[in-house]
Structures are given as C-alpha cells and as structure tokens.
C-alpha cells in the first residue's frame, strides 16, 4: 500500500456517515441531474454531461447546472453562443458549445473535445466510469497536506495515474469506486479544514 493510499484511507476514517453517503451518491445524483436536462431538451445524455463538464472549471456546482441548462436552452432554441454567459472561461464556454454543435456520437468523442484530463475525468465520473478527478483537493488528501489550490504543484500524467490508482485501491478496501472514495474524502476534507 502506498503512502498516498494510506493518507486517503486516513481521511476516509474521519468521514462522517453523512459524508460517506454523500460520496456514494454525488456522481449518481449529478448523472440524474444531467438526465433530467437531456430529457427536457431531447439531447443525448453524453452530450449534456459533456456540456456540464466543459462549463465546470472555476464554477460552483449549483451554478454549473444553471449555466448548462441555460446553454442547452439557447442552443435548442436556435440561439447563439454569444448569448451564453456561464461563470467559467470563454474558452470553456466555446468548448461546451462545440460539443453541442458537433453532436458527437459517443462518450469518447465528447472526451476528445474536452481534452483536459481533469474535465475529461469529471465527464467520465458523471457518466459512471470508475475513474476519479484528481484536482488540488485530491492531491492534498493523498499527500495529507493542506494547501491553497495555488500552492498545489502541477499534477502531471504520471502523478495523476498514481493518485487515481491510490483512490481506486482505497475505494476497493471499502467496496467503493475510485470516484466515490474521492467524493467522500473531499467532503470530509472540506469539513476538517474548513475549505
């Protein structure tokens, strides 16, 4: 067992039952929210989840859903991308619009448009794949090191894979997926460190 896995498990041990329950349902709830939008706008689920993932950087979850719903409404009513003002970067807005306008045929085609590892993993987590998002918080948990997001070092491909493997191993010890473990520890970490 790696030190990363031990640290993740140490954080998990501090999680309340409510935090564990939240971790077990967060991505399923997110998928359900996306499915509701897919039904509302008569769009494939993978496209809606791709839009949500694209609009996620620097965006709070509640606002992310509002922004995605607004963009889907503009798109399906024949509007223009310039009418959309999500709480994220313009490049991410344009990426979300690109997913809508190119109508990718499957999840992997959406992931190709998303490109970035963090948002691609977020996309796959919502779709139900057993991966996890490695962001600054996930790094802090695995390193047992509270830092601001600006202080977290760059997470390269090798480190991302090591951390994902560690979350997967920690999850398996408790009958959870990697993303369920990551979600549960993230909620516990937020409480413990008042983040």
Where are these regions (language model features)?
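HhH-family (HhH-GPD) DNA N-glycosylase catalytic core used in base-excision repair
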Residues: 1-195
